[in-house]
């Protein structure tokens, strides 16, 4: 089905938060509707693995690293499904009204080839083309899908140059971010989301790259988040990491940056191998850049190596490949960096792998 004219300009891939920011402008979010603080509530599973169409924004996000058995060829992968509520059409009775928009993107980092591959899908909800179940995680967008089956998740995202066909099995309990799943994202109470993670997923399946199939296994991380508020108006961008540690621990850390490079808000969590959870308070996470990389395409400079101070340890976060940037100036205007990175502890030992996301370095994000 052809995309509506205003949607034709969406890029092949934008970061999960960037997609939602773009959709805010395209779909007319916040059209006269006040945004209220989210109440604390108990998340119920499997229901809360499904969609929450009454909320403006939602995403299901899986990142991970995997390698082949024989030659240990390494890959990073990412798959994300987004849903956005279109406020302007909620009162329309027509079944053709686009009340929900679904986006999806997939990315594959070929470490050996030092290249990032990516693709995307977009459609309005319904008509069997784009669907999301409310009873459990079951999201479909044309030929792409992500579905929960008990304690497993199955993802199939074929594309022209690459593809993902992976299964993910839970090895740990769900991790409720923030205060029992209510995660603050700014100084105001309304700047919050319902947010849980499923770290340390055992990943197994196949990756396809330029017609060649690779049987792989590794570790993955799942995030599921939904909210009404998008971004504080003073925030220019953010830095975020989600890391699976080799000992079974899980680390989340983020900060929202102001236009002068200061920290507007920060947070995250650390869960030990035995399940002990420490949720970081504001001011306990500090991102300090160590090494920079300048994009030859956009001339944007990114910190591709960081010292990230948390109550758990002082970590070094280092990009596996420097060039994991996407330039979408011809569409949403966003230029950002997101990709596979390694985690090194204060003793200089590599203790984990995961994903680093950085936005707002080329220019501040626009609402």
PLM segments and residue spans:
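Structured soluble/peripheral alpha/beta segments that form catalytic or ligand/cofactor-binding pockets
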Residues: 3-4, 32-367
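N-terminal secretory signal peptides
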Residues: 1-14, 22-28
């Amino acid at each position: 089905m052809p995309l509506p004219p205003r949607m034709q300009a969406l890029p092949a891939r934008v970061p999960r938060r960037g997609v939602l920011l773009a959709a805010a402008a395209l779909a007319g979010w916040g059209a006269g509707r006040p945004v209220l603080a989210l109440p604390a509530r108990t998340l119920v599973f499997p229901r809360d693995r499904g969609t929450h169409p009454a909320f403006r924004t939602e995403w299901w996000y899986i990142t991970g690293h995997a390698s082949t058995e024989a030659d240990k060829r390494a890959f990073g992968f990412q798959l994300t499904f987004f849903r956005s509520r279109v406020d302007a059409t909620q009162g329309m009775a027509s079944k053709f009204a686009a009340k929900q928009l679904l986006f999806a993107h997939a990315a594959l980092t070929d470490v050996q080839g030092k290249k990032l591959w990516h693709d995307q899908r977009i459609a309005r909800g319904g008509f069997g083309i784009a669907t999301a179940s409310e009873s459990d995680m079951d999201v479909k967008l044309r030929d792409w899908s992500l579905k929960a089956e008990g304690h497993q998740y199955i993802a199939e995202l074929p594309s022209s140059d690459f593809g993902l066909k992976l299964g993910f099995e839970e090895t740990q309990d769900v991790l409720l971010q923030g205060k029992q799943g209510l995660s603050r994202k700014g100084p105001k109470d309304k700047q919050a989301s319902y947010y849980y993670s499923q770290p340390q997923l055992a990943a197994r399946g196949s990756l396809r790259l330029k017609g060649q199939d690779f049987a792989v296994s590794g570790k993955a991380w799942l995030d599921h988040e939904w909210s009404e508020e998008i971004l504080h108006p003073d925030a220019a961008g953010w830095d975020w990491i989600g890391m699976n540690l080799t000992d079974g621990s899980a680390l989340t850390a983020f900060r929202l940056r102001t236009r002068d490079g200061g920290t507007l808000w920060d947070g995250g969590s650390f869960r030990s191998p035995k399940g002990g959870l420490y949720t970081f308070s504001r001011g306990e996470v500090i991102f300090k850049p160590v090494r920079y990389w300048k994009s030859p395409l956009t001339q944007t400079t990114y910190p591709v190596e960081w010292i990230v101070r948390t109550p758990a340890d002082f970590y070094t976060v280092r990009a596996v490949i420097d060039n994991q940037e996407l330039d979408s100036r011809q569409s949403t205007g966003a230029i950002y960096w997101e990709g596979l990175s390694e985690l090194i502890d204060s003793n200089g030992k590599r203790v984990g792998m995961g994903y680093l996301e950085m936005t707002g370095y080329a220019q501040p994000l626009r609402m």
